[in-house]
Amino acid sequence: MDEIKIPKATARRLPLYYRYLIFLNDEGKEKVSSTELAEAVQVDSASIRRDFSYFGALGKRGYGYDVKNLLNFFKKILNQDTLTNVALVGVGNMGHALLNYNFKRTNNIRISAAFDINPEITGTIMSGVPVYDMSEMKKQLREQQITIAILCVPQTAAQKTANEMFDAGIKGIMNFTPLRLSAPSSVRVQNVDLATELQTLIYFLDSDKDKNKK
């Protein structure tokens, strides 16, 4: 299939659609409308139709979408048949939680190596994942051909650690540190700031309260 250019917002929604289509398929449902899909994933139906339009004719007017066909299509688009090994860099509280989780709800992503400086956990297996000393990171990333990593180190060590990851061939980082990393143009960084997300949620809740008072 030719490469399809889609907006970032659309790309973020594709896994939502895919997960719900898995549910519908497991329930034995054969077709779904954009309205039903919108209610389930909390995305308006116009956005769903626009998202799907980037991939051509996926449904029929008046019929909706064939669940099995749509599921197979997004399975291919999201590369669900290929296992992606991910490195976890930093096994503190957040890193430990991610190790325990280890994407058990997905079949195509797993944390296969973790790195830390704590001698009490390096050289051990945690939640089925080997934990290496940070001094081995570049060597292990290269040998295991890992190109995606989750960064959970303290903010003060984030950029230095990221630079070493770039040198080892990392092409994508999910950054759980508060620092906005300086990265080469060839590397994609996805920032995950839980404090900011919570503050945004609180802001909207407070705004809703103010509206209700009027």
Curated annotation (Swiss-Prot):
The keyword Cell cycle does not apply. NAD(+) binds at residues 90-95. Keywords: Cytoplasm, DNA-binding, NAD, Repressor, Transcription, Transcription regulation. Residues 16-55 bind DNA. The gene is rex. GO terms for molecular function: DNA binding; DNA-binding transcription factor activity. This is Redox-sensing transcriptional repressor Rex. Modulates transcription in response to changes in cellular NADH/NAD(+) redox state. GO terms for biological process: negative regulation of DNA-templated transcription; response to redox state. NCBIfam families: PRK05472.1-3, PRK05472.1-5, PRK05472.2-3, PRK05472.2-4, PRK05472.2-5. Its main location: cytoplasm. Homodimer. HAMAP family: Rex (MF_01131).
